[in-house]
Structure formats: C-alpha cells, structure tokens
C-alpha cells in the first residue's frame, strides 16, 4: 500500500464554533495506477504589460510558485490574453490585451493547459485568436473553452492520469455576449445553460470519471458570488460535475460545499497588473487531490500580486480548504 499524508493547520473564521486545529490527511492507494491525481487551477493569467515586460527582460513572473506548480500532475489556468503579433484591437473595448509570443516558453514551463473561455480572448479579433491557438499547439500547451468552431470550443480538455479520466470544460459568461464560436467560425464557448449541461452529460457518457466546469463568470470587484452563480453551480453538480471552479471578477469569491462537492466561485487574479484596489492583488491557486470517488482534499493557496503583476506566496495566510465529501469549508494556514 502507498500512502500520502498532509498536515494542515486550520483556523476557522469566528462564525464557526470550533477553534484552531491541525488536520492530518492520509490518502491510500492500493496500486500505482490508483494513486490520487494532483490537479492545480490558477485564475487569470494576463501576460502582456507588466508581466510581459518581466518575461521579455528574461524573468519569469511564475517563478515564486515554481515548486508548487512543478509538484502537480497537471496544471490549468485561465489565459486572459491573446498571444499574437497580428490583429487589431477591438474598437469598442476600454481594455485590450495582447501578449508577445516570447511569453510562450514561460507559459509552457508552468502550465499544461489553458482555458480560452474569457472576455479577452477576442481583444485583437479572429486573426490574433487563431494565432494564439497555433502558438499554444506548437508549444504543446492544450487549450479548451475556445476553438475554430462551436464543436471545438465545447470540446473537453481530457486528462488521463493514474487511471483517472478527467474532463474539464470551459465557458465564458461575461456580458455583453461576444466573440462566441459558431458552427463555422472561431470563438469561445458561451455559458448557455442547456449546452453546458449537455456537455457535462456527454463527457460522462464518453467515459469521464470526473467532470470539472471552469467558469468565467460573476461581477467584477464583487467578493461574493451572485445568486446566478450559486444556482447554476449547484445545478452543474446535480447534473454530474465533481466540482466547479470559477474566475473573472478579479477578486476571490469564497467557496462552499454542495452535496459533498466543492464550489470555488472565483480564484481571482494570478498574474495581472494595473489594479488599484487591494482585493484584486490577492488571488488563489487551487490544489486538488482527486481519485475516481471525487475530491479527496482541496486547498486554496494565496498569492500576493506586486506592482509588476508577479504573484508571491502569502505564507501564513488562512484560505478555504476541505476534505473529502465533508459538508464543511475549513480555513487552512498556507505553508
């Protein structure tokens, strides 16, 4: 038998009736093929402007999280910027981003896949979006939540590790509804409720042990999820999702357990500059231990983001975490 153990100090918020404690998690696996999979989700990665300048100068804005990222079996983030030299900025948008292709090696070093389902993938139009997909494919970085047509945009990211088959789906819910993939044109996957549910069911039918929707949703600057987010997150779990992960508001939005399954409403920013309010300068990295039964253990690791958009581990911070199918969100001390 193989065993992996984790010691986490917990200190719940005052609303909880118990005091600080140390939780001892042990995960057993009978064979190597059934060992838990460590999966990481990061929030918004914007690799232009300050972060882009860091990379162009030979730096790596993700270096301070290298040990954590390198330890995971698979790493996913929301790519909040097209990577291209072509295209034109969207005339009616206040903020448009475009990263130089020089950022691709750094992205490839730290992440295995990215979601394109967000409101900035189309900042420089279809030309830059197509170039982004080519750069990612050439570098061996998988992408989902966007594609050359509707079918490709809704196609899951498939992860097959240690005998566990995971399907990750990406959707954009930022309004006004724009840059949506169609039957014969490129774009991102829009969060149309019935289509999302159909995609979850299709992934389960195709053999997924676990299905994880990665949503780009919610209101910017709002530190609590909307009723829409809560209602739809719970519906996705009712329809078979193992957990739900979100981003977009540029702030974290807390977590809940629904029917024994975690919902992390927003991870906030991870690599991003240009924000003048403190809530946007702290994000979460979500680390999961998974097997065929679902989520064995999950934790959020806080990142403090500096003026250049570089995240730094916030050692000692207390952030949401949980174990197995327990109906309780704990607060764990970051290492």
Locate the predicted segments by residue.
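N-terminal secretory targeting signals
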Residues: 6, 30-34
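N-terminal secretory signal peptides that target proteins for export/translocation
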Residues: 1-13
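Bacterial N-terminal signal peptides
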Residues: 19-28
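Acidic, metal/ion-coordinating pockets
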Residues: 33-335
């Amino acid at each position: 038998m193989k065993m992996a153990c984790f010691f986490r100090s917990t200190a719940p918020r005052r609303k909880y009736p118990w005091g600080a404690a140390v939780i001892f998690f042990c995960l057993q696996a009978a064979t190597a093929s059934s060992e838990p999979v460590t999966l990481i989700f990061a929030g918004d990665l914007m690799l232009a402007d300050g972060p882009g300048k860091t990379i162009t100068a030979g730096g790596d804005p993700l270096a301070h999280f290298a040990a954590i990222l390198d330890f995971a079996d698979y790493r996913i983030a929301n790519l909040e910027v097209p990577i291209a030299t072509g295209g034109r900025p969207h005339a009616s948008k206040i903020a448009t981003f475009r990263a130089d292709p020089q950022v691709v090696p750094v992205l490839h070093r730290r992440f295995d896949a990215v979601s394109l389902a967000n409101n900035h993938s189309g900042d420089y139009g279809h030309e830059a979006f197509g170039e982004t997909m080519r750069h990612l494919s050439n570098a061996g970085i998988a992408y989902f939540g966007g594609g050359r047509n509707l079918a490709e945009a809704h196609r899951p990211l498939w992860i097959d590790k240690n005998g566990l088959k995971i399907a990750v789906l990406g959707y954009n819910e930022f309004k006004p509804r724009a840059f949506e993939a169609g039957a014969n044109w490129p774009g991102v996957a829009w969060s149309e409720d019935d289509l999302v549910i159909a995609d979850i069911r299709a992934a389960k039918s195709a053999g997924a042990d676990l299905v994880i929707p990665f949503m780009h949703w919610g209101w910017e600057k709002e530190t609590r999820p909307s009723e829409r987010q809560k209602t739809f997150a719970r519906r996705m779990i009712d329809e078979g999702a193992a957990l739900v992960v979100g981003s977009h508001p540029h702030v974290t939005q807390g977590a809940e357990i629904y029917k024994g399954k975690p919902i992390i409403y927003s991870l906030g920013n991870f690599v991003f500059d240009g924000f003048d309010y403190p809530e946007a300068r702290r994000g979460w990295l979500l680390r999961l231990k998974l097997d065929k039964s679902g989520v064995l253990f999950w934790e959020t690791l806080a990142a403090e983001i500096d003026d250049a958009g570089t995240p730094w581990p916030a050692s000692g911070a207390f952030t949401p975490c949980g174990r197995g199918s327990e109906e309780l969100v704990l607060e764990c001390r970051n290492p």
